[in-house]
Every structure is written in structure tokens, then in C-alpha cells.
Amino acid sequence: MQVSNVNDVKIYNLSCGKSLPEWLSDRKKRALQKKDVDVRRRIELIQDFEMPTVSTNIKVSRDGQYIMAAGTYKPRIRCYDTYQLSLKFERCLDSEVIKFDILSEDYSKIVFLQSDRYVELHSQHGRYYRLRIPKFGRDFAYHYPSCDLYFVGASSEVYRLNLEQGRYLNSLQTEASQINVCDINPTHHLFAAGTTEGRVECWDPRTRSRVGLLDCALSSVTADMEVEGLPSVSALKFNGPLHMAVGTSTGQVLLYDLRSNRPVIVKDHQYGLPIKSIQFHSALDLVISADSRIIKMWNKDNGKIFTSIEPEADVNDVCLYPNSGMLFTANEAPKMNVYYIPALGPAPRWCSFLDNLTEELEENPENTVYDDYKFVTRKELDELGLSHLIGSPMLRAYMHGFFMDIRLYHKVKAMVNPFAYEEYKKEKIRQKIEETRAQRVQIKKLPKVNKELALKLYEDEEEEKQLSKKKKKQKKMPNILTDDRFKVMFENPDFQVDQESEEYRLLNPLVSKISEKRKKKLKILEKLEAEGEEEEEEPEGKPSDAESSETSDDEKGWVEEVRKQRKLLRQEEKERRQERVREDQQTALKPQFYEIKAGEEFRSFQDAAKKQKLMRKTLEDRIKVEEKLGTLNVADTAVGSKQLTFTLKKSEQHRKRQEAEKQHQEERKKLRRSAGHLKSKQAKGRPFY
């Protein structure tokens, strides 16, 4: 149980204790309660008073016996019996609950407005009926005399559903584009609806006509408020026959008297968050208003703050238990908070023991400040020989150890270890020696990957250190060796810098020239500082012309170096190409053989379409085709059987080609005229050899 004191008002948070995991068995839970003091001393007012993830709404039945809460995930409703201080039942729903209301004295009649436009009516056994409204709903109110449900939402109409007749009635047409909240006065049953334009429209359910219009947007603007947009109405609540509170989306609460169109009090939460809930405490004339961050309680007559509660999680809904000082909140957290404020009223009848508990805490306040105490563990108690004091007033159990008086601790420590001061002195001397050793020159161990780069960075770091000693105002540059973001660069071999790559060789001349230029500049600065010369316009001690000429010479130098590297790269590429050509020439090409898979049939290289067409024919037709082609010969044997001879197509074509050539040669011989009978004349003159 956590106790806070805000504005001299004590607030007891009954839900701040440790919670046990649901997956633990009962035996382990009991064992944990025996071991852990905080778990054993916690106050679990209602068993399992929580939701799996988030709780959105919470209400108390009119008879005060049942507490109902809606939450997610999965969307569900839980009912707690205060007489049994435990969960009575739980029902899972199809979609998230926007708002629900208890129509009966107990939990037997409940209405749920869901996020998918469905409205569910539940009875004791479960869901009784389910229907849908035309537009997405945001709030609803129940008119008891006529049994009408008024639904408001993303529409200008107020939908009326009569539960006695079981049908929709004529809607109320408003001037607003959308309506956020609504409420019905319990005394004279005036219906009020808060719009997104910052207005409140009041209707008479008897005549179904509008009887009033309040412009709350202009009234909520104060002198010290920055207006960023038109504030809309986010909360609405009646108090008695004449008073009404309106909450805006900018964090103001306006208290109205129905006889006037101007607010009596404008209370600003100073957070700029929409007001989510407004409650009235009639006994002390207090208004309890809540946004997602804070719950404020203030006087409705003068606006003076009474107290405030700031939960750890965002608040979704607030419910005040009737005629008591107990407060329930639905939060953006699994636990639903339970607050008990004795100044608001007594504890409810079902937890009257809280009054006695708070009285005991006030009579015997525990000192929570332990400046005069020393925290010791069980092991230290054994070393000091004080284990027999466990359970006595000299030791106060706290967490995993005990608190004991600091004077007693020093006395026992001196008796047990009289040479403690000498040990302390030796330890201090050892620390001083270690500090002096750390100031000596240390050999830095180079990493396994990128050793050259690491060595270069070490050298640059040393130069910057030397310069920073002389110029204290110079900002120290970050080093990637000590940066965790670049740690992998010196550990993973995949990040090794390839100094033979083309990119590195082309970039290296430029980098080396820049580093040389930087070193030269550092030397010049050191020289100027040593001589004591301070020149603001020419910090390097050179005229502008000389500096520009030096810069141009440097640029020419590294340009020549880059050209040289490019020429070397082209020459190396040419040599590699020639080497590949020589290897290709020496390599003897061999035919490639392809193996047919097991179970596959070899098919010739003819057109597959022709073969398929041939296979569709009958055996007789195929034999005739083969006979025409000359590849198939059928002959009868002497014993009455048949003999089939197949000739390969290639050999048959070769034979035909040879026969055609032979026939052509014979025809040429017949047509040729012989010249053997002709004799040539003897040549005159000297023969030519």
C-alpha cells in the first residue's frame, strides 16, 4: 500500500503492491508469499482486479454490490462481487466496448455500445439481443420514464431506441456535425448533448424539442490560454436539478447554472488534454475531474483545489463509489487502481477494515528515512556475529537485508576487525599507485582487422591530443576506435580494407595528400604558438597569394598521382587479359557428353510434332509409311513366319546418294567426245625447260 500526502490530504493507493503471475501454481504462490515480505504485506482488496492489457470503462451498480469493468485484449467485461471480494463472472465480446451502462439495480440488465456500431443487451445469463445503429456511436444515455436509449456519435442525429416497444423512434435532429457525449438529468430528465463545435444542446424528451443552447467554446477561453483550435465538448455531467459541468478537449471544466448561459467557474487542468470524466461529491461540494494524466478534486463554489492524484498510467475512466471515500480508475495498464481517501468519506461497508488500518498507520507512523541506519545483508550479519539479533527491535527487515543503527554497526565493526583502518589505508595507497601507472605511456594493442587504419587513427589521435594541450578551447574530435558503431569494422574480417582494389588505389593519393596537408598545418600552428605570434587575418603566417599557390601545387601533385595510378591499373588489366588469352589457347576443347536420366527414352532430333502425328496413326499406316521411305522390308520365310528388316535413315540416304553419283558419271561418259585420235604439231625452236 502506497501512501501519499497531497495538500495535507492522505491518499492510499491500494493497488501498488506486487502482483503475482497468473501462470504460477497455487503452491508456488503460497511459497512466494512466505519468502517475499512485500508480497505478504500487500493489500489485494479485490481478487484479480485487473485486465489482460488495458481497462477502458468502470462502473458500480446502484446497489453497490457489483463493480463492472470493460477492457481488452481480447475485448471482455468483468463483474466483481464486493461481498465476496472476488471475480463473479467474465464475458468475452466480439469488439471493443466504447461505453456501457447498468440499467438495473444489479448486473441483470446491461447495455454495451461497441466500436463496430453494434449495441448488445445483456441479462444475467449472457447476451440477450444484438442490434446495430446507423452511425458509429460515442456515447449513450438511458431515459428511465420512457425506456428510451439515446445514442450519439458521428452524426448530427440523436438515435432513439425504445426498449419497451423494441424499435427505433424518430431521431432528434441537431445543428452539430458530430456529437461526442450526452447525459440526462436524473431530476427533471433534461437531455443534453455535447458537440464537436463546442456547444451543448438541451432537449425536452416529452416534446422532443430543443429548449436551450450553450456555447461553451467561447466561454472556455481564458486570458492566459493559447487558442490553437476550436475546443469541443469531451465530458458532460449533471449535478442536481440546476447544475451542470462541461469538460472540453483543451483541458477546461466549465460549471454552469442552468438559469444562466455563462459559466460560474472555469477550471483549467493546465495540461491541454481532453477531460475524460467528471464526478460530483455532494458531501463536500467537490468536483472530481480527470484527464489522461491527473485526477483533480476542487471545490465547486470557489474552484480551490482539494487534492489531486497522478497515476503512473494514463487514465481512461474514473468511478466514485457512492457515499464513501473510495475511487476506482480504468487505466492504460493491466491493473485497475483503487484509491482510498479518508477525507472524502469512510470506507465502504464491504471493506470497513480499511478504516482501522489507516488509523493504525496514523498512530504508529514508520520513519521511512534511514539516515541514521546502516543496511546489512544476512551474510554481513554472519560475519559480524549478529545473526541472533534477527527478529529483535535492533534489526528492521527491509528488502533482502536489514537496517541497523549506524552507531551499533561501527562498534561491532571495530570489535570484529580492529585493523580495518590499516586495510583502508593500504587500499587507498594501492589506488594511488594504480592511478600513476595509468598515466604512463601504454602500448596500444592493434586490432586483428584493419591494423594499418587503426595505427593511422592512433597517430592522428596523438597529434590532436598534443594540439589540444596547447589550445584548450579547441573541441576534441570523436574517434571511431572508441565508438561502438564502428566496432565491427575492426573485428569482422568482412570489413577488411582491400589496398589492392581499384577504388582504394585511386582514392589513396587524395587521402594521403589531405593528411600531409593537415600535418603540415599542425606544424605551422605549433610553430606560431611557440613564437607567440597571433595573427587573426593570416593564422598560418603566409600571405593569401602564397597560400593559394601552395594549394594549387598540392592539387597538381595529387592529380599527377591519380593519373599514374590509373595508368598502372590499365597496364595491369591488359596483362591479366593477355594471360587469360594464353590460358584459353592452351586449353584443349573436349566434347561434352550428356547422360539421359534413368527411365527416360531417347528421342531423335526430328520435329516432335511430326513424331506425335505419326504416333496417332494405326500400326498398318505406320508400316506403309516406313515401306515408302524404304526403311522397312517385310519378307516371308519358309516356315511361314515373317521377317522385318529395318534400315537406318542415314545409311539409306548415303546409299541413294552414291547411286545417283554413279549414274551421273555414266551419263557423262556417254555424252563425252573423245579427243584421243588428234595429234599435236611439233613445236619449233629451242625447247623450254
From Swiss-Prot:
Pfam families linked: Beta-prop_NOL10_N, NOL10_2nd, NUC153
Membrane-traversing stretches: none
Any one GO BP annotation for this protein: maturation of SSU-rRNA from tricistronic rRNA transcript (SSU-rRNA, 5.8S rRNA, LSU-rRNA)
Protein name: Nucleolar protein 10
Keyword Plastid: no
Keywords recorded for this protein, A-Z: Coiled coil, Nucleus, Repeat, WD repeat
Subcellular location: Nucleus, Nucleolus
Segments of this protein annotated with the region Disordered: 529-592, 646-689
WD repeats: 50-90, 174-213, 228-266, 270-308, 310-349
Residue stretches of biased makeup (Basic residues): 670-689
InterPro entries: Beta-prop_NOL10_N, NOL10/Enp2, NOL10_2nd, NUC153, WD40/YVTN_repeat-like_dom_sf, WD40_repeat_dom_sf, WD40_rpt
Family to which the UniProt record says this protein belongs: Belongs to the WD repeat NOL10/ENP2 family.
Coiled-coil region list: 422-476, 511-590, 647-679
Lineage of the species this protein comes from: Eukaryota, Metazoa, Chordata, Craniata, Vertebrata
Tagged with keyword Cell wall biogenesis/degradation: no
Residue spans of biased composition, Basic and acidic residues class: 554-585, 658-669
GO cellular component: 90S preribosome; nucleolus; small-subunit processome
Natural source organism: Xenopus laevis
Main location: nucleus
